[in-house]
Amino acid sequence: MLHLTLRQLRYFDALARHRHFGRAAGACAISQPALSEQIKELEEKFGTALFERCARQVRMTGLGEALAERVGTILAAVDELDGLAASHRPLRRLRLGVIPTVGPYLLPSVMQDLTAAYPDLDVHVRETITGRLAEELGQGRIDAAIVALPVAGFEATPLFTEEFLLVRPRAEAAAPPPALENLRAARLLLLEEGHCLRDQALSVCGQNPPREAFAASSLSTLVQMVGAGLGVTLIPAMAVAVEARSAPVAVTRFAAPQPSRTIGMIWRKTSPLAKPLREICEIVRRAGEAVGGIAPRG
């Protein structure tokens, strides 16, 4: 019997994810020497090294790689048990993920409404791209995520639909907007790889990236580049009130049928928090409709 402790498994998981003792120790809220000691003790129990210590990084051994996948599954199961117990108590903690093209525009009102509805709720927000949120959700590191649907493999509740609008330099405001099929030839500025909004914009204008594409990490950067006359971009309706006033740009609706996306909340199909999450969905839905979202039909 190895007699592994849950604490050791969590420390191992942190080091496997960060590949750096300092960052892993910070994530675990312990000192680096304490983390090193726990990892050393874990390796002694296995009778072999799980990590290769290098000057500036950590590499995993073959056993370490094999163990990492299983430890992630174990910790997710433990978190499910913790959630099962929590489901029989008032909701006290929520680890909520959100994509960057939603967070700045929706979260302020969502957080206010959550605080009003659940005064004792401790909310931890994680903002990152869809792929990372899906990974962390599957591993049990977050409880739910607000994303653009669809995202396969999870329980999903559509919350609202919002249009994509064309943003172009203010000097072009009087010109008719280009047809969607002509955006492929325009100087369409895009978010960098990994953002679902990039994929959605490419889907609107065709399957291939447009010429002279510029990759940014935020909608704010895209809008500023448009204001400087470097191209055009698409932004979701909820972002207009914040972003369009920060640069000399014009915002135009496309002719029907307008391109759009559906925002929803996802969680694990086995999550014991399904009932309170459905209640929270209604809070997010109302906040979305307040910033221009349209309730899903049916």
Explain the meaning of each model-derived region:
Residues 13-34:
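Short helix-boundary/capping micro-motifs
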Residues 41-60:
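A short LG(V/I)-centered, amphipathic sequence patch enriched
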Residues 43-46, 67-88, 280, 284, ...:
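Alpha-helical linker/hinge and terminal dimerization helices associated
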Residues 91-152, 216-218:
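Central regulatory/effector-binding core of bacterial HTH transcription factors
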Residues 129-133, 138-142, 147-148, 190, ...:
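Hydrophobic hinge/microswitch elements
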Residues 154-189, 193:
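Flexible hinge/capping segments at coil-to-helix
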Residues 155-165, 237, 246-259, 269:
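Short beta-strand->loop
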Residues 174-178, 186-208, 273-282, 287-297:
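Secondary-structure junction motif
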